[in-house]
């Protein structure tokens, strides 16, 4: 998705959001009921190793194979953000002022290779994150002893206590962490057998606990799923809260031309493309197939322009507010061909604490008057964006808005593969303003404040606070709230923070991208589940 301290991975999510799943037919389907889903991705996922994957495409691919102790409900919309027990019997007991989490592993669970799932596998899994330098390891760095283990790679992590006889898992944190249940539900933390090598296993993914196991991987080209042999005979009975899936096999092929994908799905050669149709065909596909073979679903993400609050002209809040008035989110909706829903606030739709408000209704005349009154001493501005799809056009639009406001602009368009690396390096010259987006790590409002709008996010490299915004009072509130469990009081405070940050206007938020799903006429679209976190749910695909 994605994010927190893994900025490069976020760039990948954005750069290849158009990806989906795919493959050719199976002879086992011929002459009988269809049991093989043929799907298409526009590009291969970053990894097919649960310790390493950090993109929406990878998480879609892995979600129904690697089950964490906690997980999310298999449901559309807000219902899909509810944390439920996964391999654990129940949600954790939290004690010691929020610093100790106790869970019990369900007895009798098996991996797809016939190995029994043990409590100690969880400890090994977290240790493996640090051994392979996973982008997900920072989420678990607050476990007692984790930072020392990250340096030495020896001796285990003392803050994780396990008992294989009872299934008891006790996790001790250095300090309370209100997001820790969400982090236990991330695919990074899905238990793997204790002997799993500390290396990238994309070509030969590790044994699975979920209904599908990944097989026959050809990196960069294709992979397949088969039913986990231990699922229906064993794990499904122990995990009744999780769906088993309808198809017996899923064949996935990479087809990099998205227009070709559309043709193939229309003609029934493939059953599903996860990525949206290309911009020049999106409206036609939507108009023809919406409700029968095409639908959109909200995803929790935010697209915005950041402004460097440390240097002129954007060190002046009045200038930043003026720019917010000048940008027209409706124009950006058109640029994104209807795939983006306009918004003007930090918290995106779907995240807890979100309450819609419109702080800066479009008013170019007012914006020009505010700039004239502020009279910034330096009007030379470099505008940054990447070259992927509509991101480039959005940057060009923003460049034009600033030009109309009287700034002397220089537009820099960077390859999407390293865009966030470049703007995340504070030694890069002229980091004045530019495009960014953020796909949630998990549905918690802290994810939109702590890494992007506090001092903690400002780093010499891998910087995620591109506005370099640090309001001491607001940062202190974010820090305090991030240690508390979400309740009505905390949600109200996050809602208030949204407004407080937008009064300071470090960003120009303009929209949230929706996820499009296009299937063949053989698929039952009505019952398809599109998770707001993981995308299309493989267990929900069913032939008519």
Map each language-model feature to its residues.
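Extracytoplasmic/peripheral linker and loop segments enriched in polar/acidic and small residues
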Residues: 25, 92, 321, 408-420, ...
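N-terminal lobe/hinge region of extracytoplasmic solute-binding protein
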Residues: 40-96, 207
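Gly/Pro-rich hinge or "lid" segments in bacterial periplasmic/extracellular proteins
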Residues: 74-78, 154, 176-249, 365
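Alpha-helical secondary-structure segments
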Residues: 117-127, 166-172, 210-211, 244-249, ...
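Append "and occasionally in soluble cytosolic enzymes with long acidic Gly/Pro-rich linkers
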Residues: 226, 233, 315-405, 468-470, ...
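Long beta-strand-rich cores associated with HINT superfamily self-processing modules
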Residues: 517-544
